[in-house]
Amino acid sequence: EHLFRIINMLRDRGCGIIYISHKMEEILRISDEVTIMRDGKWIATKAASELTMDEIIKLMVGRELTNRYPEKDNKIGDVLLNVENLSGEYTNLNNVSFQARRGEILGVAGLDGSGRTELLEQIFGITTKKSGKITLDGKEVKNRNPHESIKNGFALLTEERRATGIFGILNIRENTTISSLKKYQTGPFLNKKKMKDTTDEYIKSLRVKTPNQETKISSLSGGNQQKVILARWLLTDPTVLLLDEPTRGIDVGAKYEIYQLILDLAKKGKTVIMVSSEMAELLGVCDKILVMSGGRLSGEVDAKTTNQEEIMTLAAKYV
């Protein structure tokens, strides 16, 4: 709201403002005129008053999206992951306990600094645990570091894709296979043909838009970079997939494809834990939502029956 007030103040002073965003609600709220681009090309320029959100989406994607979220048809099974009294040594994470089931998409909501990201990083062994217990399929796992966590069946798609997700100087094949190189070892050598074949399979199955697998990942769009990172983790065959802001900075068409990938993983019996700042996204994709506040778990709600107001109230509980 403060940003919007500043933008409106600058506009009233005669400043011209170019505002770039994937969030259509913001665009329609503050813009006088909207320009839509797709694949580096100009598509349309119209007065904001003449546009609806659905019309913007259609122009952005090049086709009509009847639903913003895929229909949930995943089957939820028994408890797979049990987290008890988890606290961080150097983070604000404080006595967090929850359960996640096979085939479940578990959302994590909260304000910035609430402990959402810290929770995923703690489970994955990036940060030091002060106390608590993590049990996977009835067996305690220590997850003292990412290497150990990967061996135990965990994968983490990080919040800052460009800083901690991709290897920008490497190509798509190298980014896809880098966490699973042992699969391609033949003595001291790597089986390049097998690596190429695997990468081609994922490019096709995840519909990665790229000239070829030799393309540097840094030249891809955000959505396609995210698909490559997902392919990397799928190669490790994780049981629990931790996703931190998986659709941040991604256009609405690519978002739908990411949502479908998440749902497909849940349908295969994987447990998906997903942090998002977009409450509509959590409500549309997840089965259940944990709400973090001040490093503590302030509530757990059913995505079918809750609403944004209830989530925001819980998010402010320990602020």
List each language-model region with its residue ranges.
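Glycine-rich phosphate-binding loops of nucleotide-dependent enzymes
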Residues: 1-319
